[in-house]
Amino acid sequence: MRAGIRENVRFISKTQTDSSALVAGTFGLHASLTLSDASLDECRAAVSSDTGFHVHTAEHESDEYDSLNKTGLRVIDRLHKHGILGPRTITAHGVHFDAREIQLLCDTETWLSHQPRSNMNNGVGVTPVESMMRAGIRVCLGNDGFSNAMWEEWKAAYLLHKAHHRDPRRMHGYDVQQMAIYNNAALANVFFQNAPIGRLIPGAFADIIFVDYHPNTPMTAGNLPWHIIFGMQQSMVTATIVAGKLLMKDRQLLTLDEEEISAKAREIAPSVWGRYQAEVAKIM
């Protein structure tokens, strides 16, 4: 555990000392059910009071059961007790929060990231995103490492809640847009304050993609979410600019050797799988 704490502290310190860095960090916890009270206190004490955390919360009911059995507190109450919540902390999932936990996230201005495809894949349930947003929680759209195809996450979020509630009026396209564009940009701006993110204005970070998309019907600000959800695919992105630097042109990566990276990944994957299977065997 202490090696993990040192790694977090080292990475956070490195990004904080470089004002031009395009990477920022929060302290990476796993989940309440894998952390003792002593571990939470040690993690909190290892960094400054304005350092945020990211942590899986109530992804499955077992996380809540574990917290109640160990401490008598639900997950969010427990994290709050140990100083983990706050405006620079990101909680993931929140599938099984109760009303008090939702209110506590609002009161502490803690962020929540919604991962619809991951939750579907793990069969853990559906986060009550709409009621959370109405309550004032700043809900972002993430992917839990499921893949980097974020437009697929838009589509999953849009459809999942309709199917879950058996109501086509649920999860409006504007709600998906609010999470994926405006709230995600607002979260990024918490960590990158040198220039605005998510806006095309003078002085902002020049983060731009070019999309080879030719709509068959008019595209306006009013119907943009549905063009993204039903019309656009990640393969249509032809160029990517980050902070004014061209990283991909004509679908070719300019700063990375894709073939070399893929070959290296295939080379080391079996050893990673082997270590994982060995650890699983210890607890089975």
Label for each model-derived stretch:
Residues 28-32, 120, 192:
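Conserved short loop/turn motifs at secondary-structure junctions
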Residues 59-83, 87-89, 94-110, 118-131, ...:
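Catalytic core of soluble alpha/beta enzymes
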Residues 91-93, 114-117, 141-143, 243, ...:
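Thr-Gly-centered strand-to-loop micro-motif
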Residues 181-284:
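Active-site microenvironment of metallo-dependent hydrolases
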